[in-house]
């Protein structure tokens, strides 16, 4: 479908609106807005509920996002929710209330669907990657091999890890290592790379780039070998001051950065991993591509975008 498309992601940490222009060809991002929600903040073991104050905050965000999508003349919109809403005792009640607010349907993604869509997005931006895709949210950790034959969803997002570990990143890493060791298909990957998606993971890349004076401010396909990544992540887990300041990393992201580092470190310690590659596209782009008649996953992203730009701007 041509024209503009809006994707609203009701995540376990935040609620985000992204708007893409001309989704008939290769998508061009024109708007990206986020509201911190922390739905999974009290999600540990056992049952949990979405807190009313956070529900109210999300409802206000949805109202604002719907208005924004209409003002930007989006021809199509998809709204989806992930693990916190899926697993909360009052998740269904929240969805019914939210659907009345937006006047449309909210798709509740299963853990497998999250992993599949995240991998679809990741592979559209790094089509030559082979290995495992990691998508660490607030309430869950999704893992998929790049060939999309195997998917695993663990209830171990950064906020749930924080609760389960008693706010101890070292203990959180131990929890992750134990659970990751149970995943047999990780021993027989189609390649040797970790493809890390999401702005939280890219924050780790940005900190590493700043610490080592990397000359470009481009995190896409920035990669680290295991020994370098493990050493750097271990410093973040231990709360060491990196001695650098990076703009546009929010306090909320900084607070859970050690838990992101714990997840990445646990995977980098696998014997068959050669590097980690940080990707720009993720689950929202996967949702976008799932709505398109022709998904560009198999195309080179730079060539596809250049061709689309030439068609749009050429005279």
What do the predicted segments below correspond to?
Residues 24-41, 70, 76:
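Conserved ATP-binding subdomain of kinase catalytic cores across diverse folds
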Residues 138-145:
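Acidic, divalent-metal-coordinating active-site segment for phosphoryl/phosphodiester hydrolysis
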């Amino acid at each position: 479908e041509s024209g503009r498309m809006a994707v609203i992601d009701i995540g376990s940490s935040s609620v985000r609106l992204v708007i893409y222009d001309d989704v008939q060809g290769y998508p061009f991002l024109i708007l990206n807005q986020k509201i911190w929600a922390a739905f999974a903040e009290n999600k540990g073991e056992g049952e949990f509920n979405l807190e009313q104050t956070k529900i109210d905050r999300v409802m206000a965000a949805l109202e604002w996002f719907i208005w924004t999508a209409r003002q930007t003349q989006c021809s199509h919109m998809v709204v989806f929710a992930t693990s916190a809403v899926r697993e909360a005792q009052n998740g269904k009640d929240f969805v019914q209330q939210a659907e009345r607010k937006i006047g449309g349907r909210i798709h509740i993604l299963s853990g497998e669907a999250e992993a599949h869509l995240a991998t679809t997005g990741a592979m559209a931006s790094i089509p030559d990657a082979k290995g495992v895709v990691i998508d660490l949210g607030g309430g869950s950790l999704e893992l998929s091999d790049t060939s999309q034959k195997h998917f695993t969803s663990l209830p171990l997002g950064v906020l749930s890890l924080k609760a389960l570990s008693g706010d101890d990143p070292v203990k959180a890493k131990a929890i992750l290592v134990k659970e990751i060791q149970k995943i047999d298909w990780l021993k027989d990957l189609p390649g040797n790379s970790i493809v890390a998606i999401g702005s939280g993971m890219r924050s780790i890349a940005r900190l590493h780039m700043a610490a080592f004076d990397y000359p470009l401010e481009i995190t896409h396909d920035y990669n680290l070998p295991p020994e370098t990544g493990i050493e750097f992540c271990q410093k973040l887990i231990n709360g060491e001051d990196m001695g650098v300041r990076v703009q546009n990393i929010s306090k909320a992201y900084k607070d859970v950065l050690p838990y992101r580092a714990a997840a990445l470190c646990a995977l980098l310690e696998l014997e068959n991993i050669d590097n980690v590659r940080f990707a720009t596209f993720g689950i929202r782009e996967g949702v976008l591509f799932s709505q398109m008649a022709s998904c560009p996953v198999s195309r080179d992203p730079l060539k596809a975008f250049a061709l689309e730009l030439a068609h749009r701007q050429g005279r």
